[in-house]
């Protein structure tokens, strides 16, 4: 049985202070239980995450790198995918995707803008993760427009057990050509690559994000 099956979330949040630390603790605890489950089942590293909106969990994720063989399947990323799949139009998730489906995506109430805010669907959400996010996950959190992040352990804590997230943050501060982990070659065929930027800029019906 999944460890998280024993964790209950209050269904009626009207009678509780959802902004209190005492209430929020349950979400960090659940993220930690998800992390432990991932370790015990051999799915991936010791990381779990939950996404909360208005005091309720709308998405859960675990590190599943070992299970899938996909190196980007970190807890925060899988939680974002889970949350978006729950609040998004299911038509967007299948092979029958077509441009008209964009009309089905929610947008601000009363907005005269016919273009849905497709890439901002996790605005108003909080993410809880048992460990400090790595640079990739932090970027995903930015792109998902999540408002707040709560995490338990520090980068130095996970560094001690073999995860080099701290080194990545240090490396990212260096200029492109001085980075140590990966060789970077900026401006390679830049003028040709700019054609894609021009195509986007010239597309009159583009969906901004």
Regions found by a protein language model. Give the residues of each.
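Zinc-dependent deaminase
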Residues: 1-40, 98-123, 133-209
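Short beta-strand scaffold segments in enzyme catalytic cores
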Residues: 46-55
């Amino acid at each position: 049985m999944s460890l998280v099956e024993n964790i209950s979330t209050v269904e009626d949040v009207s009678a509780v202070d959802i902004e209190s630390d005492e209430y929020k603790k349950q979400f960090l605890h659940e993220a930690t239980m998800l992390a432990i489950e991932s370790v015990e089942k051999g799915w991936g590293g010791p990381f779990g995450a939950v996404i909360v909106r208005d005091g309720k969990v709308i998405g859960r994720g675990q590190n599943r790198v070992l299970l899938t063989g996909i190196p980007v399947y970190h807890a925060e990323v899988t939680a974002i995918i889970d949350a978006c799949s729950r609040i998004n139009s299911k038509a967007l998730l299948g092979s029958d995707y077509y441009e008209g489906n964009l009309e089905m995506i929610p947008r601000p109430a009363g907005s005269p803008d016919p273009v849905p805010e497709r890439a901002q669907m996790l605005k108003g959400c909080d993410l809880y993760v048992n460990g400090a996010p790595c640079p990739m996950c932090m970027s995903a959190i930015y792109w998902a427009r999540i408002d707040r992040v709560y995490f338990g352990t520090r980068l130095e804590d996970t560094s001690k057990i073999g995860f080099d997230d701290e080194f990545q943050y240090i490396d990212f501060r260096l200029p492109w050509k001085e980075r140590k982990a990966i060789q970077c070659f900026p401006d390679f065929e830049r003028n040709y690559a700019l054609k894609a930027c021009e195509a986007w800029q010239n597309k009159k019906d583009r969906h901004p994000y």
